[in-house]
Amino acid sequence: MPGMTRQGGQVWAHVGQAFRETAYDVVVVGAGRMGSACALFLRQLAPDVRLLLVERGGLPNEEGATILAPGVWTALDVPAGREREAAWVRRALAHDFGNVTFGPRPLLDLHAEEGEGRLPSADLLAQFPEAAGLFDPAALPFARVDLEAATYRPGAVALACGQRAVRAGADLLLNTHAHLTPGGVRLDRLTVTNTHQIVTHETHELHAGLVVVAMGADGPHAAEHELGLHTTHGRAYRQLPRLNTPSTDHTPTLRAGGLILRPQHGGFTLVPPIHHRDPHGYRPTGGRLTGVPVGVRRETLEDLLRLMAALPPLATEALEVGHSLADVPGAWLALPEGRADTPPCHQHLTEGVHLLLGGPLADPLGLAVAYDLAARVAGVGERPWA
């Protein structure tokens, strides 16, 4: 029998659990942060809707861009007019999803030139002594400060949303590759052979009144190749190198030249800027440093080299660049409208199909966009941030 929560949502975790369903009101494809949140909000807003959440992995946060998302909430990244949504997301992260390691952590946005709202960076070292040695005040003499910035674990948010959606009555089908079809989805239930190959064990055709495509960077590609629906969205492959310079719970998040130094696990996770969409057919590959192969892609390597004088720890052995691509964590990231500065969005593609995308600004705005789509599907006009 399928696993069942106390309140009725069923979970199919492996092919040994028979799946006999043939139709749902709503199928959400992809249980990352955006898909899991949308499923949860829809169950809360429309509890009579039969909903299935489908995930290729074995957990709602097992793989993809969500597990590698920076988890940095900052008002500095929020487009004008979206401030209330971002504030609602911050409150939700702090109170609504249990332990997602949410915590206030000021962000110092460092600059070489003076500008509106920027303070002398050297003066900030008295307030943030943990930042001493992380940047050169002579090279980056100005900074904007977001005292309300915070950090959290997006993967934990996705897992919490998935679990709560099931407790609220949603069904969850794991280890399943979903293909978009007219009027529904085709489900390939996956299993692993004794030679460690992932193969299709069985296939099901499922009718759905509405399909929410929350497949991250794979979503636009699936819409085009499986339904013939062209979109303007793109994707980029982002790596997150490790910097083993010590950090503490009091170390602020730093950003310079678009590069984020996110304190994590006693060191730093580096979040490089995304300059443009990757071309169709691009395959991630490591670059070369003075002729030596490294795991960091060339574009990211150039960003790190450019900032080494301003951020001295980058020029030390604390920076891990790896020997091959497999040494550096990375994932494909959706780019709404093909741009790195476009906020998350949802889009009606055709009758019965909606596309839901997070992207680079999912940390401060993703949950609000997922809620907005759920409310539209449920026919609810009010928004909690309005």
PLM features per residue range, with description:
Residues 309-386:
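C-terminal catalytic lobe of FAD-dependent flavoproteins
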